[in-house]
């Protein structure tokens, strides 16, 4: 009988010790999980050079996005562009082409914990395009004119990201823009499809929620 009582007592003691170790282990795991959940937000500006209908085109880019665990960005992007089409209209005037579009920005990121990252941005959105008068480089954009047309855009790309600091990230990359058909007099530009390449800067906080306590619980 004493043997069974001793065995039961030993089992109860072992169960209590195991339970205590499990709780401690659970706390330890939960503590370390904080280190793996990293968030970020940023504002980004960029400039790109490319072509529309074979003519030089300049782009300015703006982004605001949330970065989830250094693995994917989700936010809003906007692009304005000016294309030197030089379409002759009269002795002194030529027509160039301009527009703007914006929409959803999603950017999966590879090697997010490294100094250099590789990412695959894609933007899906809409905007408007217009022909503008170029009178010896005196650009005249008339917002009241009727010759505006809506355009829908899908723009995938490839970026190389350099983490300069916790607050600044540089990017360089290229992208290809697919657009809906444009039917706008004088019907020179049929769409705004084309490659562009350039660079940009992002300013924000890229690792909010990072665990700053490097010691294990057992070290304290």
Residue ranges, per PLM feature:
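Predominantly the C-terminal beta-signal and adjacent terminal strand-loop region
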Residues: 163-220
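Outer-envelope beta-barrel architecture signal
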Residues: 35-41, 70-72, 114-120, 166-170, ...
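Outer-membrane beta-barrel translocator domains and adjoining extracellular loop/strand segments
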Residues: 55-57, 86-91, 130-139, 182-189, ...
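Membrane-embedded beta-strand positions of outer-membrane beta-barrel proteins
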Residues: 43-45, 64, 76, 106, ...
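Gram-negative (and chloroplast) outer-membrane scaffold detector with strong preference
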Residues: 71-140, 150-152, 164
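Transmembrane beta-strands of outer-membrane beta-barrel pores
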Residues: 47-51, 78-84, 124-130, 176-180, ...
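Residues that define the transmembrane beta-barrel architecture of outer-membrane proteins
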Residues: 39-41, 56-60, 96-102, 116, ...
């Amino acid at each position: 009988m004493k043997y069974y009582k001793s065995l039961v007592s030993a089992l109860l003691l072992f169960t209590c010790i195991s339970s205590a170790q499990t709780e401690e282990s659970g706390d330890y795991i939960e503590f370390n999980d904080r280190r793996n959940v990293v968030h970020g937000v940023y504002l980004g500006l960029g400039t790109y050079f490319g072509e529309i209908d074979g003519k030089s085109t300049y782009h300015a880019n703006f982004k605001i996005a949330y970065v989830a665990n250094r693995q994917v960005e989700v936010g809003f992007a906007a692009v304005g562009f000016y294309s030197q089409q030089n379409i002759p209209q009269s002795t002194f005037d030529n027509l160039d082409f301009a527009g703007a579009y914006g929409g959803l920005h999603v950017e999966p990121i590879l090697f997010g914990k490294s100094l250099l990252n590789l990412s695959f941005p894609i933007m899906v959105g809409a905007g408007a395009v217009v022909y503008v008068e170029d009178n010896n480089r005196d650009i005249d954009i008339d917002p009241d004119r009727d010759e505006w047309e809506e355009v829908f855009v899908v723009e995938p790309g490839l970026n190389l990201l350099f983490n300069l600091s916790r607050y600044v990230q540089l990017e360089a990359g290229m992208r290809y823009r697919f657009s809906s058909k444009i039917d706008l007099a004088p019907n020179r530009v049929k769409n705004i499809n084309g490659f562009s390449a350039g660079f940009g800067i992002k300013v924000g906080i890229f690792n909010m929620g990072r665990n700053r306590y490097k010691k294990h619980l057992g070290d304290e």
